[in-house]
Protein backbone atom coordinates (compact mmCIF):
# COMPACT_ATOMS: atom_id res chain seq x y z
CA UNK A 1 0.00 0.00 0.00
CA UNK A 2 0.96 3.66 -0.42
CA UNK A 3 2.95 4.23 2.78
CA UNK A 4 1.71 7.78 3.35
CA UNK A 5 -1.93 6.72 2.99
CA UNK A 6 -1.36 3.68 5.20
CA UNK A 7 0.05 5.86 7.98
CA UNK A 8 -2.86 8.34 7.81
CA UNK A 9 -5.43 5.53 7.84
CA UNK A 10 -3.81 4.05 10.93
CA UNK A 11 -3.88 7.41 12.72
CA UNK A 12 -7.33 8.68 11.68
CA UNK A 13 -9.43 5.69 10.68
CA UNK A 14 -11.13 5.32 7.31
CA UNK A 15 -14.08 7.69 7.91
CA UNK A 16 -12.00 10.53 9.34
CA UNK A 17 -9.42 10.10 6.57
CA UNK A 18 -12.04 10.31 3.81
CA UNK A 19 -13.69 13.35 5.40
CA UNK A 20 -10.38 15.18 5.75
CA UNK A 21 -9.36 14.28 2.20
CA UNK A 22 -12.70 15.40 0.73
CA UNK A 23 -12.38 19.00 1.87
CA UNK A 24 -8.76 19.61 0.92
CA UNK A 25 -8.27 22.22 -1.79
CA UNK A 26 -7.41 20.89 -5.25
CA UNK A 27 -4.54 22.24 -7.34
CA UNK A 28 -4.12 21.31 -11.00
CA UNK A 29 -0.66 21.92 -12.40
CA UNK A 30 1.32 20.90 -15.46
CA UNK A 31 5.00 20.34 -16.08
CA UNK A 32 6.25 21.81 -19.34
CA UNK A 33 9.45 22.90 -21.02
CA UNK A 34 11.85 21.67 -23.67
CA UNK A 35 12.80 18.11 -24.55
CA UNK A 36 14.84 16.25 -21.90
CA UNK A 37 14.53 19.00 -19.30
CA UNK A 38 13.39 16.32 -16.82
CA UNK A 39 9.63 16.84 -16.60
CA UNK A 40 8.66 13.19 -16.13
CA UNK A 41 11.57 12.57 -13.77
CA UNK A 42 10.47 15.53 -11.64
CA UNK A 43 6.94 14.15 -11.28
CA UNK A 44 8.33 10.72 -10.45
CA UNK A 45 10.55 12.31 -7.79
CA UNK A 46 7.60 14.24 -6.33
CA UNK A 47 5.57 11.03 -6.05
CA UNK A 48 8.49 9.01 -4.69
CA UNK A 49 9.75 11.45 -2.06
CA UNK A 50 6.25 12.33 -0.85
CA UNK A 51 5.62 8.57 -0.40
CA UNK A 52 2.80 8.45 -2.94
CA UNK A 53 3.94 5.30 -4.79
CA UNK A 54 2.49 1.87 -4.09
CA UNK A 55 4.92 -0.98 -3.48
CA UNK A 56 3.96 -2.86 -6.65
CA UNK A 57 4.43 0.31 -8.73
CA UNK A 58 7.93 0.78 -7.32
CA UNK A 59 8.78 -2.86 -8.03
CA UNK A 60 7.59 -2.44 -11.63
CA UNK A 61 9.70 0.70 -12.06
CA UNK A 62 12.80 -1.13 -10.76
CA UNK A 63 12.18 -3.95 -13.24
CA UNK A 64 11.49 -1.64 -16.19
CA UNK A 65 14.52 0.51 -15.36
CA UNK A 66 16.82 -2.43 -16.04
CA UNK A 67 15.23 -2.85 -19.48
CA UNK A 68 14.50 0.67 -20.79
CA UNK A 69 15.74 3.02 -18.05
CA UNK A 70 18.26 5.82 -18.58
CA UNK A 71 19.62 6.24 -15.04
CA UNK A 72 22.02 3.31 -14.73
CA UNK A 73 21.56 1.24 -11.60
CA UNK A 74 19.06 3.63 -10.04
CA UNK A 75 15.30 3.38 -10.73
CA UNK A 76 14.19 5.62 -13.61
CA UNK A 77 11.38 7.56 -11.93
CA UNK A 78 10.24 9.00 -15.28
CA UNK A 79 8.76 5.57 -16.03
CA UNK A 80 6.06 6.28 -13.42
CA UNK A 81 4.40 8.65 -15.88
CA UNK A 82 5.73 7.62 -19.31
CA UNK A 83 3.26 4.77 -19.78
CA UNK A 84 3.11 4.38 -23.58
CA UNK A 85 5.44 1.79 -25.10
CA UNK A 86 6.76 4.36 -27.59
CA UNK A 87 7.49 6.77 -24.74
CA UNK A 88 9.51 4.20 -22.83
CA UNK A 89 11.42 3.03 -25.89
CA UNK A 90 12.31 6.56 -27.02
CA UNK A 91 12.71 8.06 -23.55
CA UNK A 92 10.31 10.91 -24.35
CA UNK A 93 6.79 11.99 -23.44
CA UNK A 94 4.25 11.98 -26.29
CA UNK A 95 0.79 12.06 -24.76
CA UNK A 96 -0.39 14.05 -21.75
CA UNK A 97 -0.09 11.84 -18.66
CA UNK A 98 -2.14 12.61 -15.55
CA UNK A 99 -1.18 11.63 -12.03
CA UNK A 100 -2.94 12.24 -8.72
CA UNK A 101 -1.50 12.61 -5.23
CA UNK A 102 -2.14 14.47 -2.01
CA UNK A 103 -0.28 15.86 0.98
CA UNK A 104 -1.46 16.98 4.39
CA UNK A 105 -2.37 20.39 2.94
CA UNK A 106 -3.70 19.83 -0.57
CA UNK A 107 -4.76 17.44 -3.34
CA UNK A 108 -2.97 17.60 -6.70
CA UNK A 109 -3.66 16.63 -10.29
CA UNK A 110 -0.49 16.69 -12.40
CA UNK A 111 -0.44 16.92 -16.19
CA UNK A 112 2.89 15.77 -17.59
CA UNK A 113 3.07 17.34 -21.05
CA UNK A 114 5.44 16.55 -23.94
CA UNK A 115 8.37 18.81 -24.75
CA UNK A 116 8.76 18.08 -28.47
CA UNK A 117 7.56 20.83 -30.79
CA UNK A 118 5.37 18.46 -32.82
CA UNK A 119 3.38 17.65 -29.66
CA UNK A 120 2.71 21.28 -28.75
CA UNK A 121 -1.02 20.68 -29.27
CA UNK A 122 -0.91 18.04 -26.50
CA UNK A 123 0.76 20.56 -24.21
CA UNK A 124 -1.99 23.11 -24.91
CA UNK A 125 -4.62 20.47 -24.11
CA UNK A 126 -2.99 19.69 -20.78
CA UNK A 127 -2.61 23.36 -19.88
CA UNK A 128 -6.23 24.26 -20.57
CA UNK A 129 -7.50 23.06 -17.17
CA UNK A 130 -4.49 23.92 -14.97
CA UNK A 131 -4.00 26.59 -12.31
CA UNK A 132 -0.19 26.48 -12.21
CA UNK A 133 2.54 25.85 -14.80
CA UNK A 134 5.80 24.29 -13.60
CA UNK A 135 8.24 25.27 -16.37
CA UNK A 136 11.45 23.25 -16.36
CA UNK A 137 14.76 24.59 -17.63
CA UNK A 138 17.91 22.49 -18.04
CA UNK A 139 20.62 24.31 -16.06
CA UNK A 140 23.17 23.42 -18.76
CA UNK A 141 21.12 24.77 -21.69
CA UNK A 142 19.23 27.72 -20.23
CA UNK A 143 16.06 29.21 -21.76
CA UNK A 144 15.30 27.48 -25.08
CA UNK A 145 12.75 28.09 -27.84
CA UNK A 146 10.36 25.48 -26.46
CA UNK A 147 10.63 27.07 -23.01
CA UNK A 148 9.41 30.32 -24.53
CA UNK A 149 6.74 28.53 -26.56
CA UNK A 150 5.26 26.76 -23.55
CA UNK A 151 5.41 29.91 -21.42
CA UNK A 152 3.56 31.84 -24.12
CA UNK A 153 0.86 29.16 -24.46
CA UNK A 154 0.42 28.87 -20.69
CA UNK A 155 0.01 32.63 -20.45
CA UNK A 156 -2.39 32.61 -23.42
CA UNK A 157 -4.50 29.96 -21.69
CA UNK A 158 -4.89 32.15 -18.63
CA UNK A 159 -2.50 30.42 -16.21
CA UNK A 160 -1.46 33.11 -13.74
CA UNK A 161 1.05 31.20 -11.61
CA UNK A 162 4.40 30.14 -13.10
CA UNK A 163 6.95 28.11 -11.13
CA UNK A 164 10.20 28.07 -13.09
CA UNK A 165 12.25 25.07 -11.95
CA UNK A 166 15.91 25.20 -13.00
CA UNK A 167 16.60 21.46 -13.12
CA UNK A 168 19.79 19.37 -13.33
CA UNK A 169 21.68 21.65 -10.96
CA UNK A 170 23.83 18.63 -10.10
CA UNK A 171 25.30 18.78 -13.62
CA UNK A 172 26.52 22.36 -13.13
CA UNK A 173 27.91 21.64 -9.66
CA UNK A 174 24.99 23.46 -8.01
CA UNK A 175 26.34 26.77 -9.26
CA UNK A 176 24.54 29.80 -7.83
CA UNK A 177 25.91 32.07 -10.55
CA UNK A 178 24.49 29.79 -13.27
CA UNK A 179 21.10 29.81 -11.55
CA UNK A 180 21.08 33.60 -11.29
CA UNK A 181 22.04 33.88 -14.96
CA UNK A 182 19.08 31.71 -16.04
CA UNK A 183 16.76 33.53 -13.65
CA UNK A 184 17.69 36.89 -15.15
CA UNK A 185 17.27 35.55 -18.70
CA UNK A 186 13.79 34.15 -18.01
CA UNK A 187 12.54 37.25 -16.21
CA UNK A 188 13.68 39.36 -19.17
CA UNK A 189 11.68 37.12 -21.51
CA UNK A 190 8.60 37.12 -19.25
CA UNK A 191 8.26 40.89 -19.63
CA UNK A 192 7.44 40.32 -23.32
CA UNK A 193 4.33 38.39 -22.27
CA UNK A 194 2.79 41.73 -21.21
CA UNK A 195 0.90 40.24 -18.27
CA UNK A 196 1.34 42.24 -15.04
CA UNK A 197 -0.78 39.67 -13.17
CA UNK A 198 1.73 36.85 -13.66
CA UNK A 199 3.02 35.37 -10.40
CA UNK A 200 6.48 33.93 -11.14
CA UNK A 201 8.57 31.88 -8.70
CA UNK A 202 12.02 30.63 -9.76
CA UNK A 203 13.87 27.91 -7.86
CA UNK A 204 16.82 25.52 -8.39
CA UNK A 205 16.53 21.73 -8.05
CA UNK A 206 17.75 18.35 -9.22
CA UNK A 207 14.94 15.92 -9.97
CA UNK A 208 17.35 13.01 -10.41
CA UNK A 209 19.07 13.53 -7.05
CA UNK A 210 15.98 14.82 -5.23
CA UNK A 211 17.52 18.17 -4.31
CA UNK A 212 14.97 20.84 -3.35
CA UNK A 213 11.99 18.88 -4.74
CA UNK A 214 10.27 17.74 -1.55
CA UNK A 215 12.99 18.50 0.99
CA UNK A 216 15.61 21.29 1.20
CA UNK A 217 19.08 20.38 -0.05
CA UNK A 218 22.45 20.88 1.60
CA UNK A 219 24.00 21.13 -1.86
CA UNK A 220 21.77 24.17 -2.51
CA UNK A 221 22.36 25.79 0.87
CA UNK A 222 22.73 29.19 -0.83
CA UNK A 223 19.05 29.03 -1.87
CA UNK A 224 16.89 30.37 0.97
CA UNK A 225 13.45 29.71 -0.54
CA UNK A 226 11.01 26.82 -0.15
CA UNK A 227 11.39 23.50 -1.99
CA UNK A 228 9.05 22.85 -4.92
CA UNK A 229 6.40 20.88 -3.03
CA UNK A 230 5.99 23.61 -0.40
CA UNK A 231 5.61 26.23 -3.13
CA UNK A 232 2.87 24.12 -4.73
CA UNK A 233 1.14 23.64 -1.39
CA UNK A 234 1.08 27.38 -0.72
CA UNK A 235 0.01 28.75 -4.13
CA UNK A 236 -3.15 30.79 -3.57
CA UNK A 237 -5.63 29.99 -6.34
CA UNK A 238 -8.82 30.67 -4.36
CA UNK A 239 -8.65 34.39 -5.18
CA UNK A 240 -8.60 33.55 -8.91
CA UNK A 241 -11.75 31.43 -8.69
CA UNK A 242 -14.03 33.91 -6.97
CA UNK A 243 -13.36 36.80 -9.32
CA UNK A 244 -15.70 37.76 -12.11
CA UNK A 245 -19.42 37.74 -12.76
CA UNK A 246 -21.63 34.69 -12.24
CA UNK A 247 -21.61 32.27 -15.16
CA UNK A 248 -23.40 28.91 -15.18
CA UNK A 249 -23.40 26.92 -18.46
CA UNK A 250 -26.23 24.37 -18.32
CA UNK A 251 -24.84 20.89 -18.94
CA UNK A 252 -27.95 18.83 -18.24
CA UNK A 253 -31.64 19.29 -17.44
CA UNK A 254 -32.30 17.05 -14.44
CA UNK A 255 -35.90 15.82 -14.29
CA UNK A 256 -36.07 12.55 -12.31
CA UNK A 257 -39.80 12.91 -11.65
CA UNK A 258 -42.75 15.24 -12.27
CA UNK A 259 -42.06 17.21 -9.08
CA UNK A 260 -38.46 18.19 -9.79
CA UNK A 261 -36.82 20.11 -12.62
CA UNK A 262 -33.29 21.36 -12.11
CA UNK A 263 -30.40 22.56 -14.22
CA UNK A 264 -27.10 20.82 -13.59
CA UNK A 265 -23.67 22.25 -14.28
CA UNK A 266 -20.52 23.73 -12.77
CA UNK A 267 -20.27 27.36 -11.70
CA UNK A 268 -17.68 28.79 -14.10
CA UNK A 269 -17.05 32.07 -12.28
CA UNK A 270 -18.48 34.26 -9.54
CA UNK A 271 -21.07 32.98 -7.09
CA UNK A 272 -24.82 32.46 -6.71
CA UNK A 273 -27.15 32.39 -3.69
CA UNK A 274 -30.72 31.27 -3.09
CA UNK A 275 -33.06 34.14 -3.98
CA UNK A 276 -30.75 35.73 -6.56
CA UNK A 277 -32.44 36.83 -9.77
CA UNK A 278 -31.01 35.19 -12.87
CA UNK A 279 -31.43 35.51 -16.62
CA UNK A 280 -31.44 32.52 -18.98
CA UNK A 281 -29.60 33.20 -22.23
CA UNK A 282 -30.30 33.35 -25.12
CA UNK A 283 -34.04 33.56 -24.30
CA UNK A 284 -33.58 36.48 -21.86
CA UNK A 285 -36.26 35.14 -19.50
CA UNK A 286 -35.84 35.91 -15.80
CA UNK A 287 -36.47 33.96 -12.62
CA UNK A 288 -35.04 33.51 -9.12
CA UNK A 289 -32.99 30.68 -7.66
CA UNK A 290 -35.24 28.54 -5.47
CA UNK A 291 -32.74 25.85 -4.42
CA UNK A 292 -29.08 24.94 -4.88
CA UNK A 293 -29.06 21.15 -4.81
CA UNK A 294 -26.09 18.82 -4.27
CA UNK A 295 -25.71 15.15 -3.41
CA UNK A 296 -24.90 16.08 0.19
CA UNK A 297 -27.94 18.35 0.58
CA UNK A 298 -29.02 21.87 -0.31
CA UNK A 299 -26.67 24.85 -0.13
CA UNK A 300 -27.44 28.51 0.49
CA UNK A 301 -24.77 29.60 -2.00
CA UNK A 302 -22.29 28.19 -4.51
CA UNK A 303 -18.96 29.48 -5.79
CA UNK A 304 -16.83 28.97 -8.89
CA UNK A 305 -15.76 25.37 -9.35
CA UNK A 306 -18.71 23.80 -7.55
CA UNK A 307 -20.91 21.33 -9.44
CA UNK A 308 -24.53 21.94 -8.43
CA UNK A 309 -28.12 21.71 -9.66
CA UNK A 310 -30.16 24.92 -9.64
CA UNK A 311 -33.94 24.97 -9.39
CA UNK A 312 -35.90 28.11 -10.22
CA UNK A 313 -39.09 29.66 -8.91
CA UNK A 314 -40.60 29.83 -12.41
CA UNK A 315 -41.01 27.24 -15.15
CA UNK A 316 -39.00 28.74 -18.00
CA UNK A 317 -37.58 27.04 -21.07
CA UNK A 318 -33.92 26.17 -20.48
CA UNK A 319 -31.93 23.44 -22.22
CA UNK A 320 -28.36 22.16 -22.48
CA UNK A 321 -26.05 24.84 -23.86
CA UNK A 322 -28.00 27.75 -22.36
CA UNK A 323 -26.22 30.10 -19.98
CA UNK A 324 -27.49 31.38 -16.62
CA UNK A 325 -26.21 34.77 -15.44
CA UNK A 326 -27.33 37.31 -12.86
CA UNK A 327 -29.94 39.81 -14.00
CA UNK A 328 -27.56 42.79 -13.72
CA UNK A 329 -24.95 41.11 -15.94
CA UNK A 330 -23.72 43.00 -18.97
CA UNK A 331 -22.81 39.87 -20.92
CA UNK A 332 -22.64 40.56 -24.65
CA UNK A 333 -24.34 38.45 -27.32
CA UNK A 334 -22.64 38.38 -30.70
CA UNK A 335 -21.94 36.24 -33.74
CA UNK A 336 -18.50 37.73 -34.46
CA UNK A 337 -15.32 38.00 -32.40
CA UNK A 338 -11.54 38.00 -32.51
CA UNK A 339 -9.75 35.02 -31.00
CA UNK A 340 -6.25 33.64 -30.49
CA UNK A 341 -6.31 30.20 -32.10
CA UNK A 342 -4.00 27.22 -31.58
CA UNK A 343 -4.22 24.91 -34.60
CA UNK A 344 -3.89 21.18 -33.89
CA UNK A 345 -4.06 19.25 -37.16
CA UNK A 346 -1.84 18.63 -40.18
CA UNK A 347 -4.20 20.36 -42.60
CA UNK A 348 -3.82 24.08 -42.05
CA UNK A 349 -6.60 26.43 -41.01
CA UNK A 350 -8.05 28.17 -44.06
CA UNK A 351 -10.42 31.15 -43.93
CA UNK A 352 -13.90 30.42 -45.27
CA UNK A 353 -14.18 26.77 -44.26
CA UNK A 354 -16.94 25.90 -41.80
CA UNK A 355 -16.38 23.99 -38.56
CA UNK A 356 -18.52 22.87 -35.66
CA UNK A 357 -17.66 25.10 -32.72
CA UNK A 358 -18.23 24.04 -29.11
CA UNK A 359 -18.36 26.74 -26.43
CA UNK A 360 -19.10 25.57 -22.87
CA UNK A 361 -22.08 23.21 -23.33
CA UNK A 362 -23.24 24.77 -26.60
CA UNK A 363 -22.47 23.51 -30.09
CA UNK A 364 -22.83 25.78 -33.11
CA UNK A 365 -21.30 26.33 -36.55
CA UNK A 366 -18.75 28.96 -37.54
CA UNK A 367 -15.81 29.83 -39.72
CA UNK A 368 -12.63 31.89 -39.86
CA UNK A 369 -13.19 35.09 -41.82
CA UNK A 370 -9.62 36.38 -41.71
CA UNK A 371 -6.22 35.70 -40.13
CA UNK A 372 -4.74 38.95 -38.79
CA UNK A 373 -1.33 37.50 -37.98
CA UNK A 374 0.57 34.47 -36.77
CA UNK A 375 2.85 34.67 -33.73
CA UNK A 376 6.48 33.60 -33.84
CA UNK A 377 6.55 31.88 -30.45
CA UNK A 378 10.32 32.15 -30.13
CA UNK A 379 10.60 35.90 -30.65
CA UNK A 380 6.91 36.79 -30.00
CA UNK A 381 6.97 38.76 -33.26
CA UNK A 382 3.85 38.84 -35.44
CA UNK A 383 3.82 38.19 -39.17
CA UNK A 384 1.22 37.93 -41.94
CA UNK A 385 0.02 34.53 -43.14
CA UNK A 386 -2.72 33.10 -45.35
CA UNK A 387 -2.97 29.81 -43.47
CA UNK A 388 -2.38 28.70 -39.88
CA UNK A 389 -0.25 25.50 -39.83
CA UNK A 390 -0.08 22.66 -37.31
CA UNK A 391 0.90 24.07 -33.87
CA UNK A 392 0.54 27.59 -35.26
CA UNK A 393 -0.93 30.34 -33.07
CA UNK A 394 -2.60 33.39 -34.55
CA UNK A 395 -5.22 36.10 -34.10
CA UNK A 396 -8.28 35.48 -36.27
CA UNK A 397 -11.75 36.87 -36.98
CA UNK A 398 -14.40 34.24 -36.24
CA UNK A 399 -18.06 34.36 -37.22
CA UNK A 400 -20.90 32.08 -36.10
CA UNK A 401 -24.18 31.16 -37.77
CA UNK A 402 -26.12 32.29 -34.70
CA UNK A 403 -25.85 34.83 -31.91
CA UNK A 404 -24.21 33.43 -28.75
CA UNK A 405 -23.56 34.97 -25.32
CA UNK A 406 -19.79 35.09 -24.82
CA UNK A 407 -17.04 36.45 -22.57
CA UNK A 408 -13.44 37.29 -23.22
CA UNK A 409 -11.24 34.35 -22.25
CA UNK A 410 -9.41 36.38 -19.61
CA UNK A 411 -12.76 37.14 -17.93
CA UNK A 412 -14.12 33.58 -17.96
CA UNK A 413 -12.32 30.64 -19.54
CA UNK A 414 -15.43 28.45 -19.86
CA UNK A 415 -17.50 30.98 -21.79
CA UNK A 416 -14.52 32.53 -23.57
CA UNK A 417 -12.80 29.37 -24.77
CA UNK A 418 -13.92 27.08 -27.57
CA UNK A 419 -12.82 24.25 -29.84
CA UNK A 420 -13.06 23.65 -33.59
CA UNK A 421 -14.42 20.26 -34.69
CA UNK A 422 -14.11 19.01 -38.26
CA UNK A 423 -17.66 18.48 -39.54
CA UNK A 424 -16.75 15.38 -41.54
CA UNK A 425 -14.42 13.48 -39.21
CA UNK A 426 -15.53 14.86 -35.80
CA UNK A 427 -11.85 15.39 -34.95
CA UNK A 428 -10.96 18.36 -32.74
CA UNK A 429 -8.71 20.43 -35.00
CA UNK A 430 -8.17 23.65 -33.04
CA UNK A 431 -8.76 25.61 -29.86
CA UNK A 432 -9.52 29.28 -29.44
CA UNK A 433 -9.50 31.97 -26.75
CA UNK A 434 -11.78 34.95 -27.34
CA UNK A 435 -9.91 38.26 -27.09
CA UNK A 436 -12.44 40.83 -28.30
CA UNK A 437 -16.17 40.76 -29.01
CA UNK A 438 -17.38 42.56 -32.12
CA UNK A 439 -20.01 45.29 -32.04
CA UNK A 440 -23.12 43.97 -33.76
CA UNK A 441 -24.01 47.49 -34.83
CA UNK A 442 -21.25 47.22 -37.41
CA UNK A 443 -22.94 45.97 -40.57
CA UNK A 444 -21.53 45.23 -43.98
CA UNK A 445 -22.82 46.90 -47.15
CA UNK A 446 -25.36 44.91 -49.11
CA UNK A 447 -24.70 43.94 -52.71
CA UNK A 448 -27.91 44.38 -54.69
CA UNK A 449 -26.70 41.87 -57.29
CA UNK A 450 -27.09 39.00 -54.78
CA UNK A 451 -30.68 37.91 -54.21
CA UNK A 452 -32.14 36.66 -50.92
CA UNK A 453 -32.71 33.27 -52.57
CA UNK A 454 -29.02 32.98 -53.46
CA UNK A 455 -28.00 33.79 -49.89
CA UNK A 456 -30.40 31.14 -48.53
CA UNK A 457 -29.21 28.57 -51.07
CA UNK A 458 -25.60 29.31 -50.16
CA UNK A 459 -26.38 28.78 -46.46
CA UNK A 460 -28.18 25.50 -47.27
CA UNK A 461 -25.22 24.18 -49.26
CA UNK A 462 -22.73 25.12 -46.52
CA UNK A 463 -24.87 23.39 -43.90
CA UNK A 464 -25.54 20.08 -45.68
CA UNK A 465 -22.47 19.79 -47.94
CA UNK A 466 -19.54 21.04 -45.81
CA UNK A 467 -17.09 18.89 -47.81
CA UNK A 468 -17.64 21.22 -50.77
CA UNK A 469 -15.96 23.93 -48.64
CA UNK A 470 -18.24 26.61 -50.09
CA UNK A 471 -17.48 30.10 -48.78
CA UNK A 472 -20.13 32.13 -46.97
CA UNK A 473 -21.47 34.51 -49.60
CA UNK A 474 -22.81 36.90 -46.95
CA UNK A 475 -19.24 37.49 -45.77
CA UNK A 476 -18.12 38.39 -49.28
CA UNK A 477 -20.75 41.04 -49.94
CA UNK A 478 -19.62 44.56 -50.56
Curated annotation (Swiss-Prot):
SUPFAM superfamilies: EF-Tu/eEF-1alpha/eIF2-gamma C-terminal domain, P-loop containing nucleoside triphosphate hydrolases, Translation proteins
Region G4: start-end pairs: 167-170
Residue segments, region G5: 206-208
Residues covered by region (G2): 91-95
Protein residues bound to GTP: 33-40, 112-116, 167-170
Chain segments carrying region G3: 112-115
One Pfam family here: GTP_EFTU
Keyword ATP-binding: yes
Region listing for G1, in residue ranges: 33-40
Pathway: Sulfur metabolism; hydrogen sulfide biosynthesis; sulfite from sulfate: step 1/3
Keyword terms, alphabetized: ATP-binding, GTP-binding, Nucleotide-binding, Nucleotidyltransferase, Transferase
GO molecular function, one term: sulfate adenylyltransferase (ATP) activity
Boundaries of every tr-type G domain copy: 24-240
HAMAP family: Sulf_adenylyltr_sub1
Function recorded in the entry: With CysD forms the ATP sulfurylase (ATPS) that catalyzes the adenylation of sulfate producing adenosine 5'-phosphosulfate (APS) and diphosphate, the first enzymatic step in sulfur assimilation pathway. APS synthesis involves the formation of a high-energy phosphoric-sulfuric acid anhydride bond driven by GTP hydrolysis by CysN coupled to ATP hydrolysis by CysD.
Family statement drawn from the similarity comment of this UniProt entry: Belongs to the TRAFAC class translation factor GTPase superfamily. Classic translation factor GTPase family. CysN/NodQ subfamily.
Protein name per UniProt: Sulfate adenylyltransferase subunit 1
Amino acid sequence: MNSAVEQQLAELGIEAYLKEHQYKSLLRFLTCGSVDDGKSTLIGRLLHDSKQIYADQLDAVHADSQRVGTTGERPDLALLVDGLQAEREQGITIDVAYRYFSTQKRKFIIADTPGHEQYTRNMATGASTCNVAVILIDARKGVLDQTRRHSYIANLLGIRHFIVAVNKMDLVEYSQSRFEEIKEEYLAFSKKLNNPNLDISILPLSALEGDNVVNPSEALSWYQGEPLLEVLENVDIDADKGNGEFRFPVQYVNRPNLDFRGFAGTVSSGGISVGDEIVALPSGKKSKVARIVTFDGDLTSAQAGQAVTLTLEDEIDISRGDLLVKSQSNLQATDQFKAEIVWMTEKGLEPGRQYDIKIAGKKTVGQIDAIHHQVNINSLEKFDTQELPLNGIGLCDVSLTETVSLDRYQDCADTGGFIFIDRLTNVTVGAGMIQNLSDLSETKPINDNISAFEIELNALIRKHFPHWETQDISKLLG
